[in-house]
Regions:
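Sequence-level preference for short, compositionally simple segments enriched
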Residues: 1-203
Length: 203
């Protein structure tokens, strides 16, 4: 998926979506919306906002309201083609966004706060990160990252720790979030069927 802003927009307060091995390109708030959405093994690419590549890119803008989990990125890779970027910012309601086991191809270009500290309509959020690595597989997750989130006018200060503990990550499983609907298992079944058809018809 390739666009500038709002490349992927989950415009449903109660949606439950699952994406795997998808490539998403954009510049600002290009993965945005509500609901519970699991991104598995996806490639996230930040494109240039300006011709000279200046400016800061923001990947997500969540507005979680009627669901408990929000956006979950697991085993995703971030390719950055700009000067600086961050994981995301709060939109409104009760934004939630978690990055698990992320690979950063240009970790030196991730903002120090890691998430945008200025929300659009609300400052409070649940923004978390766990086990982030560089392209060589080295764990580059800071031991702690407390951020003071505010609105653009610096009102509503909200201090939060954005680094998760291993114990906290245990609640994030496809089974727990989606219940009896197991999109991960459905995809595995389809992949096996596809391989079977290839062997049968492509010689």
């Amino acid at each position: 998926m390739l666009s500038y802003q709002d490349t992927y927009y989950s415009d449903n307060e109660k949606c439950q979506n699952y994406m795997q091995d998808t490539e998403i390109h954009g510049t600002i708030d290009f993965v945005c919306g509500a609901g519970d959405v699991w991104f598995e093994g996806c490639k996230i690419v930040t494109e240039k906002r300006t011709l000279d590549g200046s400016g800061i890119n923001i990947i997500t803008a969540t507005r979680t309201s009627d669901t408990p989990w929000g956006y979950i990125f697991n085993r995703c890779t971030i390719e950055n083609n700009v000067s600086m970027f961050n994981y995301g910012r709060s939109w409104h309601t009760s934004p939630r966004c978690v990055w698990l086991n992320t690979t950063l191809l240009t970790p030196e270009k991730l903002e120090a706060t890691r998430f945008d500290d200025e929300g659009m309509k609300i400052s409070s959020n649940y923004f978390k990160e766990y086990h982030t690595t560089d392209a060589q597989g080295h764990d580059i997750t800071p031991k702690t990252n407390k951020v003071t989130f505010t609105l653009r006018d610096h009102s509503q200060p909200f201090v939060a720790e954005t680094i998760m503990t291993r114990e906290e990550t245990k609640q994030y499983t496809v089974k727990r979030i989606f219940g009896n609907w197991r999109p991960d298992k459905i995809l595995k079944k389809l992949e096996k069927q596809s391989e079977k058809l290839k062997k049968q018809y492509i010689k």
